């Protein structure tokens, strides 16, 4: 019996098919448009507008992740703070700043302050152990070129001056400390995505909203992408030279449909998120920082609490969280069958392995799911002692799908925290799995994709890539002069030097 997809008529031939109208597809589309302006691009989005899932501003914390304040990137091992992960994340964020600056100058991202704003990044420690750790972390980072102008204090007066909401009502006997930098950012990835896609359409990219990708199958050296119009039910088949799956949580099921061996064994563990959002403008105005604390012992990195200033559509906001929940859906607007449909004979052991090993995650999720509003407010009061119930509302954030990476027995799998790139051996299809730091390092992830999937083009593309990202191929951690030049340039171009 003939495959029904194969039997269908191909309606379009394109060079690049992008699945999902979020920040990942938008970033790759912009890169390829710069490198190969003659290539045809088409983008498919199941919903009727871009950036409605994880890229939407209230579906994420909007932190420009560069390890300035996030303590999970600097673990303490045998009494020493390890900064390797922090350096790696920071280097990748510098790539983002350079790429965004290039796109600003090219008119692709014409209004940077609509999506990026300067907000201090602060690390918070309470109690003897956390304060001692925070000082060691500060000393390790402050001496490094990638972390200029880091500051630290355990002085209560300075703490109260910087973070009045966190100081007000706090016991004078509790030991606290903070380290901070004014180099932090708050980013509205929804607004950034919309600017990217407005330019993409102007430059010839066709974006089909309300179109859901149902299948992806090999067709010789190309791919047949079956797409359904969610409003009319009509089905089309597009043949593409290259397919990118930037569909957030649905990247796993779509990559499974390709049949590539590289996706075998991978799974996804969905975690829903919630925030407490402040509704009192007077309270919101008293806080101007993104403050990250330390996760509880044994808790996963996703549990790190933070009290965040947001700047969305020109208005300040304030949120606290995240609080986790559990649902089998892979997208906020997904299906309750998503998780179960993703389980295959090739990844069953991966799911079982995670279930047997991740006791910390299991305990954390059970604790979070059992929390009522009173318990959530108690967690907030560890940061903001005088928080009042009537000033905060519970909102649902985006859906995260933690990637489950296959490993050899006896463990069979491990949770891959971060962002994982999966691509076929011939480089004709690729996709992104995982969550944070996600959007913050999208340009670095797409550079890695170009190297893996278009290796034969990299020599030709090299000069243009260097125009977009002057530090390409250079570790800024070892080149203070170049870092300073790039920092000053991107600060000015992104208008981060203006209050």
Swiss-Prot record:
Gene Ontology biological process terms from the UniProt entry: tricarboxylic acid cycle
Keyword check for tRNA-binding: no
A molecular function GO annotation: L-malate dehydrogenase (quinone) activity
EC identifiers of the protein: 1.1.5.4
Keyword Oxidoreductase: yes
Keywords: FAD, Flavoprotein, Oxidoreductase, Tricarboxylic acid cycle
InterPro entries recorded: FAD/NAD-bd_sf, MQO
Lineage: superkingdom: Bacteria
Cofactors (names): FAD
SUPFAM superfamilies: FAD/NAD(P)-binding domain
Pathway: Carbohydrate metabolism; tricarboxylic acid cycle; oxaloacetate from (S)-malate (quinone route): step 1/1
Family, as annotated: Belongs to the MQO family.
Protein's name in the database: Probable malate:quinone oxidoreductase
Gene: mqo
């Amino acid at each position: 019996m003939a495959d029904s997809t194969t039997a269908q008529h191909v309606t379009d031939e394109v060079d690049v098919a992008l699945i999902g109208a979020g920040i990942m597809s938008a970033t790759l589309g912009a890169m390829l448009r710069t490198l190969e302006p003659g290539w045809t691009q088409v983008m498919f989005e199941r919903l009727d507008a871009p950036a409605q899932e994880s890229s939407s501003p209230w579906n994420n914390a909007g932190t420009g992740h560069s390890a300035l304040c996030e303590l999970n990137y600097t673990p303490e091992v045998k009494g020493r703070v390890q900064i390797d992960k922090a350096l790696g994340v920071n280097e990748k964020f510098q790539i983002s700043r350079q790429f965004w600056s290039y796109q600003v100058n090219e008119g692709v991202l014409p209004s940077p302050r609509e999506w990026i704003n300067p907000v201090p990044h602060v690390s918070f420690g309470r109690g003897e152990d956390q304060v001692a750790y925070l000082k060691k972390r500060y000393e390790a980072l402050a001496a490094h070129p990638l972390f200029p102008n880091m500051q630290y204090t355990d002085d209560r007066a300075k703490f109260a001056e910087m973070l009045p909401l966190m100081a007000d009502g706090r016991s004078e006997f509790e030991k606290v400390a903070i380290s901070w930098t004014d180099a932090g950012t708050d980013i509205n990835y929804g607004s950034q995505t919309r600017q990217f896609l407005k330019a993409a359409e102007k430059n010839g990219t066709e974006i089909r909203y309300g179109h859901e990708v149902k299948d992806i199958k090999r067709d010789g050296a190309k791919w047949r992408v079956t797409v359904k119009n969610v409003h009319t039910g009509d089905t089309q088949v597009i043949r593409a030279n290259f397919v990118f799956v930037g569909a957030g949580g649905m990247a796993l099921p779509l990559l499974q449909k390709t049949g590539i061996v590289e996706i075998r064994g991978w799974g996804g563990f969905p975690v829903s998120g919630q925030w407490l959002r402040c509704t009192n403008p007077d309270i919101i105005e008293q806080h101007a920082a993104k403050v990250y604390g330390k996760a509880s012992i044994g808790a996963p990195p996703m549990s790190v609490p933070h009290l965040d200033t947001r700047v969305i559509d020109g208005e300040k906001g304030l949120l606290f969280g995240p609080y986790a929940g559990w649902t089998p859906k892979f997208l906020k607007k997904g299906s309750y069958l998503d998780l179960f449909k993703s389980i295959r004979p090739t990844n069953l052991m991966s799911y079982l392995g995670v279930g047997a090993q991740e006791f910390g995650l299991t305990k954390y999720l059970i604790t979070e799911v059992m929390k009522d509003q009173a318990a959530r407010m108690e967690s907030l009061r560890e940061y903001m002692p005088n928080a009042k119930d009537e000033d905060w509302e519970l909102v649902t954030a985006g859906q995260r799908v933690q990637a489950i990476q296959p490993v050899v027995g006896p463990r069979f799998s491990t949770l891959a925290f971060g962002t994982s790139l999966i691509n076929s051996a011939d480089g004709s299809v690729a996709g992104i799995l995982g969550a944070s730091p996600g959007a913050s390092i999208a340009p670095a992830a797409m550079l890695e994709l170009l190297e893996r999937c278009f290796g034969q083009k990299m020599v030709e593309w090299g000069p243009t890539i260097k125009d977009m990202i002057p530090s390409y191929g250079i570790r800024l951690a070892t080149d203070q002069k170049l870092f300073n030049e790039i920092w000053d340039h991107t600060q000015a171009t992104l208008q981060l030097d203006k209050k």
